[in-house]
Amino acid sequence: MSAKSDSRNNKAVKSDEPKKRRRKKARTAEVSDSDSSDSESDRAEEDDNEDNEDTTNHVIDEGDVEMMEFDKDDAAAAASAQTMDIPAELQSLPADSANPEFQKFYLNLVTSEFGKDMDELRTSKTFNDNTLGLLVDALKQGVNVFDEKVQGEIVQQQS
């Protein structure tokens, strides 16, 4: 048998194997005019070389494992650094800086004005414990729109 027929026989055996990722790359790669002049035997050699490269890439070295562990340490350090980036004036604020009397007044006003909308939210299929917390937090954020002086004036007017 000639070398060409051997390579064709090998191709028949390889076609029984599951397709590899390189097949997808071959379909999506752009082909220039110079590539179209390649012969079938050159393409077969390139396919064989790619097969060998695919199997060698699956071996993990100890250095790779060390790099993965290093990446995990970097991710943990980055997460802790993000919590440290909070400005000092925001860290010193209490959890709820609004006047409690004003907060009560504001939340009662909002719930009475938007009662129908809130009922629609509560009866929707997507409403659950998590979204309840989000709704409450969103309503409480409206209190922070007013500064302390305005909050005090509104509370005095209501009393």
Curated annotation (Swiss-Prot):
Chain positions covered by the region annotation Disordered: 1-63
Q: Which UniProt keywords apply?
A: Nucleus, Ribonucleoprotein, Ribosome biogenesis
Q: Compositionally biased, Acidic residues: which spans? A: 32-54
Q: Where in the cell is it found?
A: Nucleus, Nucleolus
**What residues form the membrane-spanning segments?**
none
Q: Any keyword Nucleus?
A: yes
Answer whether the UniProt record assigns the keyword Protein biosynthesis to this protein.
no
> What's a BP term from Gene Ontology annotated to this protein?
ribosomal large subunit assembly
In terms of InterPro entries, this protein maps to: Ribosome_Assembly_3, Rsa3_C
- Compositional bias, Basic and acidic residues, is annotated for 1-19
Q: What assembly does the database describe for this protein? A: Associates with nucleolar pre-ribosomal particles.
The function of this protein is:
Required for efficient biogenesis of the 60S ribosomal subunit.
Family to which the UniProt record says this protein belongs:
Belongs to the RSA3 family.
Q: What is this protein called?
A: Ribosome assembly protein 3
Encoding gene, per UniProt annotation: RSA3
